[in-house]
């Protein structure tokens, strides 16, 4: 399906571009969200007639987004979750969770503004991109921890996941050391028998 874009769409084009997309993408995303119109002759003429108005509105929204960017970019938000000893979460942190954390922190955000390259399934600090406008994005840090105290330690630069890995590695090394120092089953009998033979000689 060919559509005319009503705003910039990442990896697709700029406002006014006529592009070809898959029917499902157009019907399920672009058209219902008013990001594009079917590229019919009537719709293209309609767009051109409103282009100046749309560009002015887009510029206004972009300026507002840039103002929000100066406030939210680089901010950190804490999300507390249950996790195992190795830091793996019982579940994951969703875009809705992140939007809620931002709202609780005083910033208005919708879940569809949150971009996750992959699900957050471990404790730690995770960089997340927030789309404030088709041409303006901000990066925030999501501090996922089991407790407030852990969140503060992570914010101070401590890697609790790495610390757990180091502790486990040290425990394994210690166990292997003591095992190597102990005699295997039957070694004591063999050693005693050898001493008896030496005594007879």
From Swiss-Prot:
Residues 166-201 have a biased composition (Acidic residues). GO terms for cellular component: ribonucleoprotein complex; ribosome. One of its GO terms (molecular function) is structural constituent of ribosome. GO terms for biological process: translation. Residues 150-201 are annotated as: Disordered. Residues 150-165 have a biased composition (Basic and acidic residues). The keyword Ribosomal protein applies. It holds the Pfam family Ribosomal_L9_C. InterPro entries: Ribosomal_bL9, Ribosomal_bL9/RNase_H1_N, Ribosomal_bL9_bac/chp, Ribosomal_bL9_C, Ribosomal_bL9_C_sf, Ribosomal_bL9_N, Ribosomal_bL9_N_sf. Coiled coil: none annotated. Keywords: Ribonucleoprotein, Ribosomal protein, RNA-binding, rRNA-binding. Belongs to the bacterial ribosomal protein bL9 family. Binds to the 23S rRNA. This is Large ribosomal subunit protein bL9. It comes from Parvibaculum lavamentivorans (strain DS-1 / DSM 13023 / NCIMB 13966). The lineage of its organism: Bacteria, Pseudomonadati, Pseudomonadota, Alphaproteobacteria, Hyphomicrobiales.
